[in-house]
């Protein structure tokens, strides 16, 4: 159970103005209504749940779960078998492109219960599980991020209309599992339970590219207990999958290559549809292999690594940031740098946004009035995040990929106001502590 959160008595919480409240609720409420109503109109015009769900990424997850559940785990990456299972699951409809299982084999073991269900029922159950995960996450993030009831309402509307979250729910993707894993790490870190933190982060192994920078941050922090717990959890997952499904890694990578060849640009590696530094470079140069493109990618990677080192290595020349702020910025650096990031994967930025919103609000109460405008700028840019993702989903301007440019701007402002964010006491930037039951 969770104890009610009481703001620290030494912190003067900033009251959100009514104008900002009404503007936020109106704008993001409208965007939420547009997104949800548009999907509902489309969904209601489908003759069945199967005809709706076969268009989404969940079909890939289901094929893997179905293969293991029906005793074909050793043939998990046999594309011919995957085609047969896909056609059987979506009958009487036929999907024109092969959309096979393209995730590590241990992830399919988690979904075996869904593989025992018909495709339509599995999609509905998975959607319900994801909604529960989102509700649990927001229940921990929103109350402690808001100073007033109005701010809680505004943050709820903003989070509910976050396009990566909506895409993850509709597509039936893995993002909520990764989100819950990251939240478990954050909560466990606050409780002083490093082993729980490492085990929680194992949930994000379904998309390991999303947690590379957080793992590097834990290593730079010398949080060996969390890393040991993570390594043990990862070892159990890998060992179990090898024991039950055979030596799958070589077959897995071969199947990925075959899927890319068969699906061409609609396949697994589509940089112009991504939202990371790689997509930023591709939008500018329309290639990833030219000299300027490679040079810019190298500069962005080195800058991200330099930022990571600055966050986690102590220095006498700069004050230390609270752990939660460092972790939030590490998450954003990781999303910017990862080579594979579609818009639905940006759902894991939710904790980062809330933690930075908290910290900047606390910092506003601790700096002189004349020095508050950069922090207000930071909060304004944070508030624009969901709108940027909404525009990125609907609009693809030439030479510009909105989300990575937005992340660079947000990170730049946060690093610029390092000294102000460092004023916040570590206990004042964190979500409500949990009690073991």
Language-model segments: residues:
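Generic transmembrane alpha-helix signature in multi-pass membrane proteins
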Residues: 110-111, 199-201, 212-215
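Primarily membrane-embedded glycan-assembly and transfer machineries that use lipid-linked glycans
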Residues: 2-196, 218-350, 426-427, 431-437
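Short basic/hydrophobic patches in alpha-helices and adjacent helix-turn junctions
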Residues: 67, 283, 334-339, 353-362, ...
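Hydrophobic/aromatic-rich transmembrane helices and adjacent perimembrane loops
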Residues: 342-358, 406-407
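Structural signature of hydrophobic alpha-helical transmembrane segments
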Residues: 173, 202-203
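Aromatic-enriched
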Residues: 357-437
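Hydrophobic alpha-helical segments of integral membrane proteins
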Residues: 33, 202, 338, 356-357, ...
